[in-house]
């Protein structure tokens, strides 16, 4: 059974810059003007990452544009946003990202079937330059293979 997801924003660079070892879903605490702006698709999570502050996890550098029709009650575009996770999940995440070289990266932001905003997070390890070159070579080779198959 496939889940309904209306994708708002994706972080395509994360798949190039990191090895994604584990994926998880988290809710996010938002203000009303932020939700309205997300419904218009005005969000970017290209540079966003998550970090722990004690017993909580926050999403940093997530840009949600201001909602034009909200007057003085508008939100700050790049404020830290709290992620909603179970305590066991938070402890597991903190244990994993405290290891050197690991980070918590936002992969996508979407509305689920109940119209709640969710963030897909990935526990990731950074790629070295030669790893990035290898992934480019693999992608080019797959593209060439598909061209050769189509020509036959």
Swiss-Prot record:
It is found in: Cytoplasm. One of its GO terms (molecular function) is RNA binding. PANTHER family: SSRA-BINDING PROTEIN (PTHR30308:SF2), TMRNA-BINDING COMPONENT OF TRANS-TRANSLATION TAGGING COMPLEX (PTHR30308). InterPro entries: SmpB (IPR023620), SsrA-bd_prot (IPR000037). It comes from the Bacteria. Pfam families: SmpB (PF01668). Belongs to the SmpB family. The keyword RNA-binding applies. This is SsrA-binding protein. CDD domains: SmpB. Required for rescue of stalled ribosomes mediated by trans-translation. Binds to transfer-messenger RNA (tmRNA), required for stable association of tmRNA with ribosomes. tmRNA and SmpB together mimic tRNA shape, replacing the anticodon stem-loop with SmpB. tmRNA is encoded by the ssrA gene; the 2 termini fold to resemble tRNA(Ala) and it encodes a 'tag peptide', a short internal open reading frame. During trans-translation Ala-aminoacylated tmRNA acts like a tRNA, entering the A-site of stalled ribosomes, displacing the stalled mRNA. The keyword Cytoplasm applies. Keywords: Cytoplasm, RNA-binding. One of its GO terms (cellular component) is cytosol. One of its GO terms (biological process) is trans-translation. Its main location: cytoplasm.
């Amino acid at each position: 059974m496939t889940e309904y997801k209306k994708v708002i924003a994706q972080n395509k660079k994360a798949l190039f810059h990191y090895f994604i070892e584990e994926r998880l879903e988290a809710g996010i605490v938002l203000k009303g003007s932020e939700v309205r702006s997300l419904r218009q698709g005005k969000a970017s999570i290209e540079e966003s990452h998550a970090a722990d502050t004690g017993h909580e996890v926050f999403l940093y550098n997530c840009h949600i544009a201001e909602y034009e029709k909200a007057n003085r009650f508008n939100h700050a575009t790049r404020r830290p946003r709290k992620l909603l996770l179970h305590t066991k999940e938070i402890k597991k995440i903190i244990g994993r990202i405290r290891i050197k070289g690991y980070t918590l990266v936002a992969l996508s932001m979407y509305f689920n079937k109940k119209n709640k905003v969710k963030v897909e997070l990935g526990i990731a390890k950074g790629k070295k330059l030669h790893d990035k070159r290898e992934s480019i070579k693999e992608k080019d080779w797959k593209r060439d293979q598909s061209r050769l198959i189509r020509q036959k």
